[in-house]
Swiss-Prot record:
Residues 1-21 form the signal peptide. Keywords: Signal. Belongs to the UPF0319 family. Disulfide bonds: none annotated. This is UPF0319 protein VSAL_I2129. It comes from the Bacteria.
Length: 208
């Protein structure tokens, strides 16, 4: 009887620890978090706080963001926006924060686009390893449908690509500025990638 009680208590403890184990990502005000694991997110923040937080399950995650430091020049606020950055990391039960260089002018902050010298650190000030890339297409910065372009990026072999979430993204209805949805764009994308024989089979299937 005591053994069963001990076993039950142990299972309850393990369940409790498993349920409470998670990642907390702290996002400063100068970071524009666009997507997490290919989805838009809502951050938790308080009225007087300069940071926001996001809870994630333990494991591998992909974040997409811009770095937008703000500089005061007279009565004006000058914002320097970086290119869109894709990053993939793995963590377990850690509080993670962004760390960026300290820039004292907009001109110096523009160097971030070249250096990409930021870090992720946990609650013990230890570095969280990550892979990163700019979300660009043929050298041009993406501006319209980030989720669609990210879905294409995730089909590549880049170390920052996030394979496991592709199906979720390609089936989600997301309208872009031209009124096209992501499913339609993905169909066009894969049609262009296919050989002639596959294209003919596709056209036959949709005409029947």
């Amino acid at each position: 009887m005591k053994f069963h009680s001990f076993l039950a208590a142990g299972l309850c403890l393990l369940t409790s620890l498993s349920a409470s184990a998670s990642i907390q990502l702290t996002v400063p005000s100068e970071v524009e978090l666009l997507l997490v694991d290919s989805q838009e997110v809502k951050l938790d923040s308080s009225f007087f706080s300069t940071t926001s937080t996001l809870k994630l399950d333990d494991g591998e995650h992909q974040i997409v963001f811009r770095y937008n430091p703000v500089f005061k020049q007279g009565k004006d606020n000058i914002i320097v926006s970086s290119d869109i950055i894709v990053s993939k990391f793995t963590a377990t039960n850690q509080d993670i924060s962004f760390v960026f260089p300290s820039y004292n002018s907009p001109e110096k902050a523009k160097a971030f686009n070249t250096d990409l010298n930021w870090e992720l650190k946990d609650q013990n000030d230890k570095n969280i390893p990550f892979a990163q890339a700019k979300l660009v297409y043929d050298g041009v910065q993406i501006g319209h449908n980030i989720q669609f372009e990210l879905a294409k990026f995730n089909t590549t072999e880049h170390v920052a690509a996030f394979k496991q979430d592709m199906i979720t993204v390609t089936h989600k209805e997301i309208k872009n500025e031209k009124g096209e949805n992501t499913a339609e764009q993905m169909l066009n994308y894969w049609y262009e990638k296919a050989d002639k024989e596959t294209q003919e089979r596709f056209k036959t299937s949709i005409s029947n």
